[in-house]
């Protein structure tokens, strides 16, 4: 098989699109000195919500997507409440949130998959269908275009707007940012809401791609998203988290995974390679900070 075959390149781009969107949310939480571990569970929740709105309630594409994204903002507000109001450290707060949201998603979906023509707990048959327009979102080129648009908007917002520079200032030195009059609380809330929105968008794209809701479908994207964010931070981020670097990190992971498959490396060994790459990226990041 030829690695540079156009179909293989398209497959890589399709495979990294969801990871990239979720990882940019992680990167935005990193800009303010935080860290969001709940993005995988949020993606799972969005996956279940959007499919259920089609299959159980018969809503259209636009309504289902908007309702799902609106509900995902509640996850960001919940994270912000734990971190800003209760002052729980970011990683511990979002770890707790990970389990809460995962439980909510499992409970909402009755612990199973949501598909067309499924049998409801009441014994009736679900009559709703997934619109063709929604299914197109998860296909090439639409999913790749969405990934690139999200990357571009996030990169421009972080690099060329006052709010982006303020977020970097808060992440770099919170005390100095506070003394200079920046509203740290407001930016922390915004960062976690945006991270949850992007995780929700990732879950929606996943739902479009697979055409159903699977139990904890977004959970597998957490570590890849974290790895992409940190790899981009260290290798292509100029010493700070950014969307373009995150895209580069996702591409590196996508190429690595694709190459391992072509080399017939067992799937259960791939996490070892990814873990070593992430460890190297983290080591490089902290080495750069010390120097």
Please place each PLM-identified region on the residue numbering.
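Helix-loop-helix "hairpin" substructures at the membrane interface of multi-pass membrane proteins
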Residues: 59-68, 74-79, 136-213
């Amino acid at each position: 098989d030829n690695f540079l075959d156009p179909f293989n390149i398209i497959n890589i781009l399709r495979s990294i699109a969801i990871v990239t969107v979720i990882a940019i949310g992680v990167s935005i939480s990193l800009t303010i000195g935080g860290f969001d571990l709940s993005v995988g569970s949020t993606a799972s929740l969005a996956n279940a919500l959007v499919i259920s709105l089609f299959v159980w309630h018969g809503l259209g594409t636009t309504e289902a997507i908007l309702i799902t994204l609106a509900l995902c903002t509640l996850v960001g507000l919940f994270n912000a409440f734990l971190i800003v109001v209760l002052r729980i450290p970011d990683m511990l707060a979002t770890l707790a949130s990970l389990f809460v949201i995962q439980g909510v998603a499992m409970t909402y979906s009755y612990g199973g998959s949501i598909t067309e023509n499924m049998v409801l707990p009441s014994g009736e048959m679900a009559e709703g269908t997934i619109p063709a327009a929604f299914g197109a979102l998860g296909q090439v080129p639409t999913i790749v275009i969405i990934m690139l648009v999200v990357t571009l908007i996030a990169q421009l917002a972080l690099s060329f707007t006052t709010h982006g520079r303020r977020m970097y200032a808060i992440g770099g030195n919170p005390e100095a940012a506070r003394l200079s009059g920046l509203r740290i609380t407001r930016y922390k809330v915004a960062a976690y809401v945006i991270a949850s929105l992007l995780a929700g968008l990732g879950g929606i794209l996943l739902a479009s791609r697979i055409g159903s809701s699977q139990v904890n479908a977004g959970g597998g994207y957490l570590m890849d998203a974290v790895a992409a964010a940190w790899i981009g931070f260290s290798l292509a981020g100029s010493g700070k988290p950014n969307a373009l670097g995150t895209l580069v990190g996702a591409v590196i992971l996508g190429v690595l995974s694709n190459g391992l498959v072509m080399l017939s490396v067992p799937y259960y060994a791939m996490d070892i390679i990814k873990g070593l790459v992430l460890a190297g990226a983290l080591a490089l990041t902290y080495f750069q900070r010390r120097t």
